[in-house]
Amino acid sequence: MFTQSDTGKIEEIFTTNTMAFETTAITFFFILLICFICILLLLAIFLYKCYRGHNHEEPLKTLCTGEGCVAANAEMDKPEDQDKVLMHFLNMGLPMKPSILVQKQSKEEMATSLGDNIKAEDYQKKQTYEPVNARETNHEGELAEKMPIHVHRSSDTGSQKRPLKGVTFSKEVIVVDLGNEYPTPRSYAREHKERK
């Protein structure tokens, strides 16, 4: 059925298919090897930087003797002083840039301010209802002549509402330094809420 030429063609097709498969497999293997080498190289660089950064964070202590040295060592052990010295060295030689400072209130301050707001709302509600109750004791003729007194909240207290369940309110103070044009920084207070 098959002749000699058909058998040769089949063998030729089979050898070309296996060669194409081998070249694809070798190419895939080289790409995989290059990716593995790059990952190892990045890991080595990361570990080197971590190790190098860890060594520089430890403070260098100088050896000294005498009474003045004990006081100097006691002062250097305070964390506040170390932060000041560190910030001084970090900011040395850098020009001042326009910046934004965000300061958040602590939870205790927020709890007291929210409590004060609720008390203020209750007080204002009492003020609106007390004149109405006082007018009821007057004669009916006088009551008809007087217009009802409405007490409106200011815009500051109107924007503050009671907290919702599962919502955290926080207040930020944003200080904006506008550079050389406006030498005094300006601050803005902004409230926002976050869901838990």
Swiss-Prot record:
Membrane topology per record: Single-pass membrane protein
Record keywords: Membrane, Transmembrane, Transmembrane helix
GO cellular component: membrane
InterPro entries in the record: DUF4642 (IPR027813)
Chief location of this protein within or outside the cell: membrane
Segments traversing the membrane: 26-46
Subcellular location: Membrane
Cross-referenced PANTHER family: HYPOTHETICAL PROTEIN LOC690352 (PTHR37882)
Protein name: Uncharacterized protein C2orf74 homolog
